UniProtKB/Swiss-Prot annotation:
Protein name, per record: Protein archease
InterPro entries: Archease, Archease_arc, Archease_dom, Archease_dom_sf
Annotated residues for binding of Ca(2+): D12, D138, I139
Signal peptide: none
Keywords: Calcium, Metal-binding, tRNA processing
PANTHER family, per the entry: ARCHEASE, PROTEIN ARCHEASE
Similarity-based family: Belongs to the archease family.
GO process annotations (BP): tRNA splicing, via endonucleolytic cleavage and ligation
Biological role stated in the UniProt entry: Activates the tRNA-splicing ligase complex by facilitating the enzymatic turnover of catalytic subunit RtcB. Acts by promoting the guanylylation of RtcB, a key intermediate step in tRNA ligation. Can also alter the NTP specificity of RtcB such that ATP, dGTP or ITP is used efficiently.
GO molecular function: calcium ion binding
Length: 139
């Protein structure tokens, strides 16, 4: 199964992430965001970061998850290439782990920096057992 794909969006980047579960789709969404910034296959898993978020709804939970990851890039130049997510829909909470390392210009390709997550065109759906997350990131 394809984990994610990109779609054209004026001045920003659109992402469609897929998963066999909601958790896997959230993991794919995070991977796609970092793939915009670098080749995630070159990221080693030297650092583990734990993230806990509470959302008002599923869209807000996705927004908070991606924004939290971007804060680590903005503050510590951390790039992530692997994720593990657990979601409690009853309490609308997310517990996640992100694995990666600090950006190294000699090792990591510098692509487009993602500035922020947005709610623009955000849609979370399920089709034939596949969860689909569609959203736009600001670059």
């Amino acid at each position: 199964m394809t984990r994610f794909e990109f779609f054209d969006h004026t001045a920003d980047i659109g992402i469609i992430a897929y998963g066999r579960s909601l958790e896997e789709a959230f993991e794919s969404a995070a991977l796609a965001v970092f793939e915009v910034m670098t080749d995630t296959s070159k990221i080693e898993y030297k650092v583990e970061v734990e993230i806990e978020e509470i959302g008002s709804d599923l869209e807000n939970l996705l927004y908070r998850w991606i924004e939290s990851l971007l804060v680590y890039y903005d503050s510590d130049l951390l790039l992530f290439g692997k994720f593990k997510v657990s979601i409690d829909l009853n309490n609308m909470t997310l517990k996640g782990k992100a694995y990666g390392e600090k950006f190294n210009p000699e090792k990591h390709e510098r692509r487009t920096v993602v500035k922020a997550m947005t709610y623009h065109e955000m849609l979370i759906s399920q089709n034939d057992g596949t969860y689909i997350l569609r959203f736009v990131v600001d670059i």
